Amino acid sequence: MSYIIDRRLNSKKKSTVNRQRFLRRYKQHIKKAVSDAIDKRSIQDMDRGEKIGIPSKDISEPVFHHDSGGVDTRVLPGNDQFHSGDRIQRPPSGQGGGGSGKGASDSGEGMDEFVFQITQEEFLNFMFEDLALPNLVKRQLAGIEEFEMRRAGFSNEGSPGKINVVRSLRSANSRRIALTSKKRKQLKELEARIAQLQAEPIADSATELEELEAEAAKLRAKIKRVPWLDTFDLKYNLHVKHPIPHSRAVMFCLMDVSGSMDQATKDVAKRFFLLLFLFLQRNYEKIEVVFIRHHTSAKEVNEEEFFYSRETGGTIVSSALHLMDEIIRERYPPNQWNIYGAQASDGDNWNDDSTTCYKVLTENIMPKVQYFSYIEITPRDHQALWAAYESVLRDFPKSFAMRQLEGADEIYPVFRDLFQKQVA
């Protein structure tokens, strides 16, 4: 008889492989459902799972069967409504065909769509599947290599802190069974013979009984001498160093919080950066994020202050660009880091400052960055800042992008457009 021993590590999720295969098979259905969910949800509500419905007709399995061959005679009922070649109209919703939906019906039959739940991680994976930081170039400091420790099974040697208790006890039990099974079988036979002689004494049974008991005592002693746990049984969790092919990247997030930005515009900007921050956290382990808020002056802040501070003022966009340039020179050498920038504004700026923005971008920032994106959140006509940035776009068409947003419903499409994966 064959025995199958499941040695997979995910003992509590043994259907994981089947689930992954199912998700790959119905990828298009799931991506469409995720896209529909994104349209309905707010940005703050992105970080959870979703229920996915797949029509029953799409999950039916093809089968091989015998064709209805041969010759047969059938008598079919006639009708007084249709003739040969007529097309039968589809029954109204809720009657023929059955299926999911509201309302009752006294006719028709069908099958509801198959509904299942995808996890938060799966939802975000489908959401960001086709996105990436453009122009990501691998750069590392010469002579510096990073490693991570990965599980590599088990070893017979290791430090006491890495002992695998379950594996060690299992090995000890197997060894004891292997070394004592023959003796235990002999002992069992002797004990059965001793019990028989004690129950039914015969002539000269006393001598034989003493010999059997002596032999049984020897077997028990031999079995007892087999150690319960031996150094041979000890198993240790084995971890090996695995080199990490990584790219060092930093993303600068610049947001206008001046008085010209009303609350609705600030909310759209916050949502865009929340989505960007979530995307970076989900897709890149080795990336730093620098938050810069600006009005007449710019300041580097933490995540909490960036999104929720109430500070406001006038508008000098170049202050944020100057600060970004200073931080790059101080902390992020371009030959060691992949540098990215994302800026959100309503387009308003102080007189003559737009020319300064163009100069700072073209001379100081764009030669150092891999990619810089600018979104202007306004339904109005563009102003001088947009014109200045159009000049930057002409000078750096491959590493600079700019888009206009008029409302929150355009955030995700514009986001996907800016960070679409590029075909190599």
UniProtKB/Swiss-Prot annotation:
Chain positions covered by the region annotation Disordered: 52-109
InterPro entries xref list: UPF0229
Bias kind Basic and acidic residues: ranges: 58-69
Family, similarity comment: Belongs to the UPF0229 family.
Name of this protein: UPF0229 protein Sde_0732
